[in-house]
Structures are given as C-alpha cells and as structure tokens.
C-alpha cells in the first residue's frame, strides 16, 4: 500500500493523511509513503501506528520524517523513516493520493511490490523478482557465514577476504 504526500495546506481535505491507506490495506501489508516534499514535518505518527497495527498492517516505510517513534517501538510496530521529528504535518503537508505509483529515494515503488526493511536499510522488489533475489541473497549469506567461520577458526582477514574477493566484486543484477 502506498501513499503520496506533498507540501502545503490542502484546500479541502476530507480525511487525515494515511488513514485511507490504513483502512484499505490488507492484513500483512506494509504502508510505503513518499514524503519528499522538502518540508520538515512528520508524515506518520503514533495514532496512525496504532490504527495501522489494529488493522493488521505490518509496518511503515516513509521517505521523510516521522514522529512518535518510541511509541511505535513500544507497540512493536516497525516504522522506518529518514529521521525522527516532533513537528506535525498539520498545515505543512497533505496526502494527494494512495495506492498509487510513488518514488522512494529515486526508486519506483508500486502497490504490490515487496518490502524488506531492517535497521540497515530498506529494499523494494517487484513481486516477480522476489524468488530470484532471495535465492541470490541466500548464496551470499552462506558465503559470508563461511568467511566468519574461517575468521573464528583463526584465519587472517586478508586471507579470508582475499579468497572471496573476486566473487565479492561481482555485481548481481
């Protein structure tokens, strides 16, 4: 489920930002929000986190600031954003569309794309590519597991990395 926010004060807004996405999301969805308006205000907050969690949403990714991050953490509701902020969106940013194509960090995201997120970052994949990407990621993870095992067995880092260097340089498209 996607949401697009822009800067400014809406002429007429029939609803609070992101609420339609919360109510339209299927159980297990992640809400992804384009909030590249340039306005330093929250595009997501605590009440939305509770509403989303109650409706079965698994988490939120916002390309911009979010507020009430500690509250979301206490709920066990993942919120991944560019930065925390206390300033609300009221009169500063509003929703222009949801369940639409958006851009996150220069990457095209459409409803139905798969989202992987953790404290290291966020990845968006077209659903058709998930199986292949997971297969390749498993291969990389196994190689890294063996490298760590060798280091713990006493091998020198230059040797371990050196043995794997050429493969590590290979970009997987």
Regions found by a protein language model. Give the residues of each.
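Feature captures the catalytic cores and cofactor-binding loops of soluble hydro-lyases/lyases
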Residues: 1-111, 125-173
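C-terminal binding/interaction regions
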Residues: 115
């Amino acid at each position: 489920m996607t949401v697009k926010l822009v800067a400014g004060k809406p002429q007429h807004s029939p609803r609070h930002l992101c609420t339609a996405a919360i109510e339209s999301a299927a159980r297990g969805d992640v809400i992804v929000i384009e909030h590249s308006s340039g306005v330093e205000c929250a595009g997501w907050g605590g009440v939305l986190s509770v509403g989303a969690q109650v409706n079965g949403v698994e988490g939120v990714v916002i390309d911009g600031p979010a507020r009430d991050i500690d509250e979301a953490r206490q709920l066990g509701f993942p919120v991944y954003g560019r930065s925390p902020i206390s300033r609300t969106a009221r009169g500063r940013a509003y929703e222009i569309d949801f369940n639409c194509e958006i851009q996150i960090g220069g990457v095209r995201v459409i409803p139905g794309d798969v989202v992987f997120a953790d404290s290291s970052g966020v990845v968006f994949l077209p659903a058709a590519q998930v199986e292949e990407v997971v297969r390749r990621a498993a291969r990389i993870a196994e190689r890294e597991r063996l490298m760590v095992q060798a280091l713990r067995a006493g091998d020198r880092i230059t040797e371990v990395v050196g043995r794997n260097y050429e493969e590590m340089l290979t970009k997987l498209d």
